[in-house]
Amino acid sequence: VTLAVLAAAALPGAAGAATSAPSDSTPVTLSASPLGVDIAPWDPVYSTTANFNAVQPLLKAAGFNEIHYSGGVTADQYDWQTDTDLSNCPAGQTFADFSAACVTSDALDFSLLSQHARDLGAQTFATVNYGTGTPDLAAAWVAQAAATPGQQVSDWEIGNESYGCWMEDEWLADPPANIADYVPNGPCPTTAVMANSYAVHAGDYMTAMKAADPNAQIGVPWAFDNGVGGAAVANNTTWNDTILQADGADISFVDAHWYPFSFGGNTDPAGKKNPSDQQVIQSVMQIPSEYAKIRGTLNTYDPGAQVIIGETGVSFLETGVPCLPAGALFAAGDVLSWLAAGAQSVNWWPLDTNTNLDYTGTSNCQQDEAMFTNPRNPATASPRPLTPYVGYLLASALAKPGAQLSELSQQGDVLRFQSVLPGGKVAVALINTNTGSAKTATAGSSLSPYLTVQTYSAGNQNSTNTKIATTATTAAAIASGITLPAESIVVLTQRTPKPSGMSLTATSATVKAGTKVTLTGNLTLNGAAAPAGVSVKVNRQVGGRTQATLTVKTAAGGGFTVTDIPPATGSYTYAASYVSNTYLPATANHAVTVTAAKPALKLAASAKSVKPGTKVTVTASLGAPHVNKTLVIYAQVKGGAKKVIKRATVNAKGQLSVVFTVKANTTFTVTFAGDTWYTAGSAAAAVKA
């Protein structure tokens, strides 16, 4: 990373900033190492056993698969053979005096770095020393890496930000051989002079490195223009065109260091006000156009060359952003935007610094650039993630090696990314860059029914601003859109729900009308009994149509019981179901046949024998069911026809009475026509006269 203050440019992310394309981008197949981090030889975390043991699992959890080694300006002062650098040299030292006067030993040598990288499952991307090194020193490194198991390097870069005056070793009394027109304490050479010098000397490096390993992948620094806040120069096209035209045949990639801002502390170098959090987050909207510029130049000189983002961050200076939720949103948008545009990998600068030595949370978080804190005493405290780590962690759900990543069309302030992962599952990231308002966005149409939702929101945070809330939903539930809190990231990933099971039985498969049907069932979730209080629905169905829905909750052990009285005779199906966002649906059916019951119909006369002309009371008793039921009472005098003497609805007791004058032997009959529960019936009584 740069150590000098550059001329300030307009703040990206403000009004008029470039935005992403209005349509979905073409899916890009991600490399084997899309997610990277910069680690320098002086790194105090990765070189300390206790710190390493704390950080490595977190790097694995976030899917880091590249380490960019040798570290910013240190790269051009670092001797990999002695594991020393010259960063503490006072001004005015001669080149010959370096090793004797001011050598500094580093803790993280190449062997240990390689061991840690292989444990992480990461590739190594190394920058060789172009400042105080030589082609032979670089070639020896390449040879050892190729010949030593576990020390392989996937990509080699010649020099760090060699287009910038801050890399000219201006404190020297005499220059290294590869720096042209050097004047001690004098002005920086022009971009053209620097580019021509680099093209010649970098060619010498390439020749030596290729001789050591013909398969070595070698890259060079890419210079942004001054419209980019950090690691940028005027006349950048002179640098890029000169190098690519001269050495393009041997260049496998360019290394672009992207810092959209150049502020640190309370103001940027020009004294301007710091950008707002929203401006910081929305600065990533420039990335598609910046990548297009790089690719356009490469297509002219070296179409096969790849683009590596060897360093990135909000600014090349320490800021408060890594303490804030904006740091997570920026980091996620940064890495996903570059990868979706076509970058081979994106490396955050740096893993850690010496800034947050006593960190306990946001209350004492110091301005920083890093992903992790560096505890003053590893024996009593462990490195803690800062918010850029959270951004990479969330982005890793999409940025899998071999995935097909695309940036979907932007919806207002919402950035949208979709990744088809190896195996076919789909993941989506939605970033609401608006820090003041919630926004609604759609997630595309490729998601499976069951989804895991990870939400990182500035408005719902813990004391370290690293809280990610995890819930579950379905594609159907968010088909019309998902509401994103202000300043938030929502990541949707497909999931395979846990299994569930259900049984359902009844006391009998056949019951008489008017009788309760008692059903018992059991619900299991992921092979174990469901806890008490889980809701189960039981539908009473006829011919596939639901007549009624009963809701019941499980008891301890997963059992449940429900009772019902079917409204009529016939065949019924009771369908029990359980639906959730966590488990697969569970269903169970049970068939019940309801048959008609015989009514308890009786008929009685007030007397069995009377004198002719005597009035008798004839009473019919229906019994259950008797509410609103109609009976018909007949009288048939001996030798005469059967006649209706009363047709009426029974009273509340289920009875119907009639007074009849008996003149001769008479037979009384009562009939019930039947209904949906009961069969037709009749009863008779005789009176002699």
Where are these regions (language model features)?
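Carbohydrate-binding surface patches
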Residues: 410-448, 453-456, 490
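C-terminal beta-strand-rich structural cap/linker in extracellular carbohydrate-active enzymes
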Residues: 471-498, 666
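Short strand-edge motifs at loop-to-beta-strand transitions and within beta-strands
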Residues: 480, 558-562, 654-658
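Proline-enriched interdomain boundary motifs that mark the N-terminal boundary
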Residues: 499-507, 598-605
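Noncatalytic carbohydrate-binding groove/subsite architecture in carbohydrate-active enzymes
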Residues: 193-334, 341
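Enriched for extracellular/lumenal, surface-exposed ectodomains of secreted and cell-surface proteins
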Residues: 566-588, 662-682
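N-terminal catalytic cores of secreted or lumenal carbohydrate-active enzymes
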Residues: 18-249
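Aromatic/acidic polysaccharide-binding cleft in carbohydrate-active enzymes
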Residues: 309, 313-399, 403-416
